[in-house]
């Protein structure tokens, strides 16, 4: 009987330790990994509360993101538009691990820096890219992708 109690106690401590690890990773500040203009747009949308502190838990709920280089962002939680934030880099986008829909719209002359490896978006179901120079596109890890649209992107296949 003591052995069973000891085993259950150890299992519970392991679960508790794992929860602490998960919670601590959710509280990791990744603000320095984001493009400043992308941070400004996310702040204006009230997706983040502070541009100097972006916790993974702050952005984990975002499933639908639309970016324009002229720029406005919308998501399921808040459909407000931002004022002009000229985003030239997608640096930081890779931290949106819950994205199900992503739409990127440019003006045909745009070349975005830091094009992410889209295959890291495991939950992505819809990807639409319009008028952004995109020489290559890796979606090999997007097993849930059901809708892909790339228009006027100069994509090399």
Spans of model-derived segments:
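Sec-dependent N-terminal signal peptides
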Residues: 4-13
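Sterically constrained small-residue positions within well-ordered secondary structures
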Residues: 10, 56-58, 151
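N-terminal capping/linker segments that flank leucine-rich repeat
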Residues: 14-108, 117-122, 126, 131, ...
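Short intrinsically disordered, low-complexity coil segments enriched in acidic
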Residues: 40, 154-157
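Leucine-rich repeat
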Residues: 88, 110-113, 115-118, 131-135, 138, 153, 156
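A detector of tandem-repeat and repeat-rich interaction/domain scaffolds
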Residues: 139-140, 144-150, 157
């Amino acid at each position: 009987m003591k052995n069973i109690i000891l085993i259950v106690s150890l299992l519970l401590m392991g679960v508790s330790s794992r929860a602490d690890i998960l919670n601590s990773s959710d509280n990791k500040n990744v603000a320095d990994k984001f493009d400043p203009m992308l941070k400004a747009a996310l702040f204006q949308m009230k997706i983040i509360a502070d541009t100097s502190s972006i916790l993974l838990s702050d952005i984990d709920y975002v499933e639908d993101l639309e970016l324009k280089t002229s720029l406005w962002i919308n998501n399921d939680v808040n459909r407000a538009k931002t004022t002009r934030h000229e985003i030239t880099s997608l640096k930081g986008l890779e931290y949106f691990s819950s994205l199900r829909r992503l739409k990127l719209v440019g003006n045909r002359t745009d070349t975005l820096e830091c094009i992410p490896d889209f295959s890291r978006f495991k939950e992505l179901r819809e990807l639409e890219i319009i008028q952004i120079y995109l020489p290559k596109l890796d979606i090999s890890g997007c097993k849930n992708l059901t809708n892909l649209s790339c228009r006027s992107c100069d994509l090399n296949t």
